[in-house]
Amino acid sequence: MTMTKTQVLDLLKEHRNERGIEHWKKRGVKDSKLKSFGIGLTQLRKLAKQIGRDHKLALQLWASDYYDAKVLGLLIDEPKKVTREQAERQVEHLQGGYLAHVFSSCDATLAKTPFAFELATEWMNSKDPVRRRCGYGLLYELSKKKVKGMDDDYLLERITFIRDQIHEEEMWVCEAMNTALMGIGKRNQVLNEAAIAAAKAIGPVDIDYGEDNSCEPLDVLKHLTSPHVKKKFKST
């Protein structure tokens, strides 16, 4: 049965997490009216599966002033009903990039749209850092799939660009580029070798996640040289 926005908000209230709310108050977006029920992404994914795909409800939740509701809106949207115009509107309201990860990466609905590759290419070359971040987030998701136009030559050029430009970028774009490099390098043997060479040339990528956060920057080289990845290529 289709749920209403009110029912979803009631569901979120039932799952509110006081510890998460305190964390939000410390880490939330400055100068924003956005509120939070303090619910983690893992729990929100479970709720999204419970609710099911619903484009109309997704747009209603996106219009909410609760972070958790906006995330659910992104998770339950229907890829075939999302338009370029909608994506361009939403990317303008990611709360300074706070919602960028769920919007463009992290198994994002946007990466499942028919225009995802075209959008990723356009956004990676944008003058807007939030769009660039999202473009690389999409590239990471797309690197897991077969996509028309995204051949090895295209990805080798992107590896070179990441290698040469990553340390010139803003911090969160840097993080997205680093993640995309890892995704590309797991695609096949040729791209793996190129991505490893790039990762060695790049060296450490510093990301400031804050003093009260245990997150550490992604070690791309470690991932790309792991026994699991090596075994994957030996079997192909």
Describe the role of every protein-language-model region:
Residues 1-236:
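Alpha-helical scaffold domains
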